[in-house]
Amino acid sequence: MANYLTAKLPGIGGSIKTCPDDFLVEELPLYPTCGEGEHLYLEVEKRGMTTFELLKRLSRALQVNERAMGYAGLKDAQATTRQFISVTDCSAEQALALQLQDIRILSARRHRNKLRLGHLAGNRFTITIRDIDSDALEKARDILHVLQMTGVPNFFGEQRYGALGNSHLIGQAIVQKNFSQAAAHIIGDPDKIIHPEWRQGAILYAENRLEEAEQALPRRMRNERNLVRSLRQGRSAEKAVRRLPGKLLRLYLSAYQSHLFDRLVSMRLESLETLWTGDIAYKHDNGACFLVTDAALEQPRADRFEISPTAPLFGHKVMMAEAQAGILEQALLAKEGITPDDFRLGAGLSMPGERRPLRIPISETASNQQGNELELSFSLPKGSFATTVLHEVMKTDV
């Protein structure tokens, strides 16, 4: 992300995530627990690990089936996070007695249903920004005021683009049916790879020395090695790519959707709060979308942050905007050389698409400075990212 909604306001610079305690994420539940039922909701604090690692360690310690465990969202590994995990066949006393390194069970309460992905209202963030100037607090508060009035640009950002920053390019190549290009991106550009064995494997792949490339790639890179093996055995690039795990391929496609969405946010960054006739508007209270036939009539609702303009996560079923907003969307598709129907990929890979608001509300903001450190707190709805707020406040790559 190179664009700023608050471009006229200077950032505070600084650095984040010097240690996991500098970045605290607290999950905001979608509904309260009722106190009865077969599912036990654990409020868990983890430090410096992924949600998947947390699930694995809890399942072993509690001797419960990991597949029966539920969670509402994935949380940052390079942080201290508090989130809810649902388990069955476990007592509250057993869970609360657990003593695990970097894991704390904060509470345990029963509920009737399993926790599912998306069952959260949002997240609250408390972030320490270090190495800042003496006037950082005033600058941060000025920026936060603008974000509260206008909304936060709903960028995905580059965290979805993988280790080489090219996941969206893999997704693009798949949608464009250029599977040879997709395979090349999956193996990686040697000039962008630091790991020596991976780099050597990528060089050999680029030279079409497939057997040597397969041997050179690190053994932990199973998907890449399997891809090269499929090609070496004579399969087409399309068949070789499609043999990769569907979950991985959908991540690539999702990254491409996110990339295109971010480009549309950038195009409308200077007027995120302004509705256009032909927009598809998003209702913040229930997530419903509708066509704006009279922008002037609906604008007061946008001013109250009841509704916002949207852009598509492109897919074969997505509702497209009309008039000026529709022209922007169609122009981007034309530039990419694709249509919404190109996301109809079959074999479990088809992406139906959806609308996503261009902006999201930020609430419960607080800031405090002690010397060259600033503590920043705020809450965001689910599906949005703290990095966007930090991007605006710091004016640096986050």
Swiss-Prot record:
Residues 151-360 form the TRUD domain. GO terms for molecular function: RNA binding; tRNA pseudouridine(13) synthase activity. InterPro entries: PsdUridine_synth_cat_dom_sf, PsdUridine_synth_TruD, PsdUridine_synth_TruD_CS, PsdUridine_synth_TruD_insert, TruD_catalytic, TruD_pseudoU_synthase. Its EC number is 5.4.99.27. GO terms for cellular component: cytosol. The active site is at 76 (nucleophile). Keywords: Isomerase, tRNA processing. It is an enzyme of class 5 (isomerase). One of its GO terms (biological process) is tRNA pseudouridine synthesis. It catalyses: uridine(13) in tRNA = pseudouridine(13) in tRNA. HAMAP family: TruD. Belongs to the pseudouridine synthase TruD family. Responsible for synthesis of pseudouridine from uracil-13 in transfer RNAs. This is tRNA pseudouridine synthase D. It comes from Syntrophotalea carbinolica (strain DSM 2380 / NBRC 103641 / GraBd1).
